[in-house]
């Protein structure tokens, strides 16, 4: 496959008991946050109760600043010293243009709501806009700096610190390995898209092409889909979505890069990037049936990519690492149930 390839048997570091078996109680942030809004009389629920194909899915773009602060306060999963950990809802951007409602834009209000007073709170690590999962905040600049140095050192040493859970449409050929690809950002039709580059030259690297690397491990398979753990070893926008599309197994709910995977007579192949525009992910009838979704509902399917675990250094050099965990969103758990995907 030219500039990208899968290498068998990734190095260790996988968390073996993630507690991600799909159960009706794995609500993540959804239930508490929704009840918080309902008590405030919010008039913007996602769908009528009982008719929700994506339970627990919030739409941050419809919230007022006050409502978003309520949701984020209810999404706190851990607070210790200067560190606060949130379980970010899918669809909430961390940064954005001036005037846009983002995590950064409400940090002052959130800080006061959490009792941190006027201390400046920094985002140390966060899942991307379309992904759900962990956000690590710090009210201490020295702690934030120490953690940033730890993450940078870990990347250089090829030691994973973040583990994502993903449901993929398709099953990787190997059960465990590495995905390597040279990627670049390209402005196409007014949108910044990640584009793979085969055999990049030194000039390409100088002009912004980056060699990227991710580990993956297949946890379970069923109904032509897979539950996959992903560990990025480099930092690049939409890296995990682009990597899984290159493996012909796009992430469920990826309405940007899944269009690059074509199918003829049951065989999947990569379509030319230059002639493939982002579009709503198309799922076959059998998969729609297993998910109990109509085609129009599938067009609103959220990205099933969740930052589940962050690995942090201990307080002292000889202390064991600390693991922060964020429960899966309810809609993610529902998908696992529908597809019969369970952690073994």
Curated annotation (Swiss-Prot):
GO biological process entries: mRNA processing; positive regulation of mitochondrial translation; pseudouridine synthesis
Name the catalysed reactions. a uridine in mRNA = a pseudouridine in mRNA
Question: What ranges does the record give for the region Disordered, renumbered to this chain?
Answer: 29-59
Sorted UniProt keywords: Isomerase, Mitochondrion, mRNA processing, Phosphoprotein, Transit peptide
Q: What is its EC number?
A: 5.4.99.-
Q: Basic residues compositional bias: what residue ranges?
A: 32-42
Among its keywords, does the record have Transcription?
Answer: no
Cross-referenced SUPFAM superfamilies: Pseudouridine synthase
What main location does UniProt list? mitochondrion
Role played? Catalyzes uridine to pseudouridine isomerization (pseudouridylation) of specific mitochondrial mRNAs (mt-mRNAs), a post-transcriptional modification necessary for their translation. Acts at position 390 in COXI mt-mRNA and at position 697-699 in mitochondrial COXIII mt-mRNA. As a component of a functional protein-RNA module, consisting of RCC1L, NGRN, RPUSD3, RPUSD4, TRUB2, FASTKD2 and 16S mitochondrial ribosomal RNA (16S mt-rRNA), controls 16S mt-rRNA abundance and may play a role in mitochondrial ribosome biogenesis.
Q: What is this protein called?
A: Mitochondrial mRNA pseudouridine synthase RPUSD3
Q: Which organism does this sequence originate in? A: Bos taurus
């Amino acid at each position: 496959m030219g500039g990208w390839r899968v290498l068998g048997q990734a190095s260790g570091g996988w968390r073996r008991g993630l507690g991600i078996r799909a159960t009706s109680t794995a609500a993540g942030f959804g239930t508490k946050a929704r009840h918080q809004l309902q008590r405030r009389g919010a008039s913007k629920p996602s769908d009528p109760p009982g008719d929700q194909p994506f339970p627990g899915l919030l739409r941050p773009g419809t919230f007022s600043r006050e409502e978003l602060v309520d949701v984020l306060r209810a999404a706190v999963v851990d607070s210790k010293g200067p560190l606060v950990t949130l379980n970010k809802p899918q669809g909430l951007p961390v940064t954005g243009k001036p005037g846009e409602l983002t995590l950064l834009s409400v940090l002052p209000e959130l800080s006061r709501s959490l009792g941190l007073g006027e201390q400046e709170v920094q985002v140390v690590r966060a899942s991307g806009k379309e992904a759900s999962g962990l956000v690590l905040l710090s009210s201490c600049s020295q702690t934030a700096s120490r953690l940033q140095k730890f993450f940078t050192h870990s990347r250089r040493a090829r030691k994973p610190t973040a583990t994502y859970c993903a449901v993929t449409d398709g099953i990787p050929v190997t059960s465990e390995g590495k995905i390597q690809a040279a990627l670049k950002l390209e402005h196409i039709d007014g949108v910044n898209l990640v584009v793979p580059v085969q055999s990049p030259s030194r000039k390409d690297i100088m002009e912004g092409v980056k060699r990227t690397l991710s580990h993956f491990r297949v946890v379970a398979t069923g109904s032509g889909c897979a539950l996959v753990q992903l560990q990025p070893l480099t930092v690049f926008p939409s890296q995990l979505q682009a990597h899984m599309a290159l493996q012909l197994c796009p992430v469920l709910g990826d309405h940007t890069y899944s269009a690059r995977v074509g199918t003829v007579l049951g065989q999947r192949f990569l379509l030319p990037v230059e002639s493939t525009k982002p579009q709503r992910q198309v799922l076959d009838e059998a998969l729609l049936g297993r998910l109990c979704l109509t085609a129009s509902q599938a067009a609103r399917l959220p990205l099933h990519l969740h930052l589940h675990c962050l690995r942090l250094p201990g307080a002292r050099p000889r202390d064991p690492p600390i693991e922060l965990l964020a429960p899966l969103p309810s809609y993610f758990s529902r998908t696992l149930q529908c597809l019969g995907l369970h952690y073994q």
